[in-house]
Amino acid sequence: MFNFANFYKLIAQDTILQPWLNTLPQQLTDWQNAEHGDIERWLKALKKIPEGCAENIDLKTSVTLSNNSPLIDGERKKLESLLRTFHPWRKGPFTVHDIHIDTEWRSDWKWDRVLPHLSPLKNRSILDVGCGNGYHMLRMLGEGARLCVGIDPSHLFLVQFEAIRKLMGNDQRAHLLPLGIEQLPELNAFDTVFSMGVLYHRRSPLDHLILLKNQLVAGGELVLETLVIDGDENAVLMPVDRYAQMRNVYFFPSAKALKVWLESVGFIDVKIVDECVTTTGEQRSTEWMKHNSLPEYLDPTDSSKTIEGHPAPKRAILIARKPD
C-alpha cells in the first residue's frame, strides 16, 4: 500500500531518531492492515499520478509546481481528474502544472501569520503534529528545513501528500506518518515542533502540551496555534455539545490562559504573537471542497457567533521554548 522504507533508512542513520525503529514499523503495519472503504480507489488514482520532478518548484512563496513547457491540454485534464479523486481538499492551496487546487482553507494565510515569529527554520528538524496533507511542511522546506516529519492519522491526507510529493520527484526531506502524537515515544529530537489546529480536539490539553514538549530537543521551539476565546487568564470555554458543528472539540482557553497552561507544564519564554478572527475568506467551500464550511457554521443573523451561539472562531499563535 504505502512504502515507508525510505523513512526507516533515514532515521536508522540518525542517532537521535534511531530508537524510533523499535516501535514505528509495527505501528505503520497495523495501520495499513486496518480497513478503509475508499483507500483502494484513492491508491488506484495515486498510482496513475505521473512520476518525476517538476522542473520549477516554488515552496518559498507558495506551493507551485510547473515545467518550462506547460503540459499539453489532454495531460493536464487527466492530471486534474486524478487530483479531484482525492476530494475533499481541505488544506492548501496548491498550483500544479497550471491546475489551481483551491482548498477549503487558505493555509497560506496562516503561514503568513506564523512565519515572522519563528526562529529561522534553515537546517532544522521539524515535527508537525496534525499536519493535514502536509501543506505547511512544504512551506517549511521552502524556508530551508533539513527534515520535516508530519503526523496525522487521516488516510486521505496521506494520499494527497503522496500525490503532491510524487509530482515533486518524491522529495525525501518531508515525510507524513499516519499516527497520532500519543503513539510517539519521547524522542526529544526535533528543533521545532508545530501543533496547529489540534489542541481543541484534545480531551486533556495539558497532557497534549506535555507530549509536544517531549518531542523537542533541549532549547527547542514550540509553535502552538489553536482556537481561543476572549478573556483573562481564567477564561475557558467548554462547549456542552457542538462548536461550529464540530462534535470532537473540548477546550477553548483565552490566549492568556493558554500562556499559563504552557508555563505550568514547563515551557519558558512563552509569547502570544498573534490573535485573529477566522473569516469566511479563509475557510469556505470551493470546487475542490464541496461540503459545508464556515459560512454555514455561523449564525446567519450575527456572524460574531456560531450557529450554536458560541463566539465565532478566533485563533491565537503562541511561541514557547523548552528549557535548555
From Swiss-Prot:
Highest taxon of the lineage: Bacteria
Molecular function via GO: transferase activity, transferring alkyl or aryl (other than methyl) groups
Keyword Transferase applies: yes
Binding site residues for carboxy-S-adenosyl-L-methionine: 91, 105, 110, 130, 152-154, 181-182, 196, 200, 315
Keyword tRNA processing: yes
GO BP terms: tRNA wobble uridine modification
InterPro entries reported for this sequence: CmoB, Mo5U34_MeTrfas-like, SAM-dependent_MTases_sf
Catalysed reactions listed for this entry: carboxy-S-adenosyl-L-methionine + 5-hydroxyuridine(34) in tRNA = 5-carboxymethoxyuridine(34) in tRNA + S-adenosyl-L-homocysteine + H(+)
E.C. designation(s): 2.5.1.-
Keywords (A to Z) from UniProt: Transferase, tRNA processing
Family recorded in the similarity comment: Belongs to the class I-like SAM-binding methyltransferase superfamily. CmoB family.
Task of the protein: Catalyzes carboxymethyl transfer from carboxy-S-adenosyl-L-methionine (Cx-SAM) to 5-hydroxyuridine (ho5U) to form 5-carboxymethoxyuridine (cmo5U) at position 34 in tRNAs.
Subunit note: Homotetramer.
Protein name: tRNA U34 carboxymethyltransferase
Species, as recorded: Aliivibrio salmonicida (strain LFI1238) (Vibrio salmonicida (strain LFI1238))
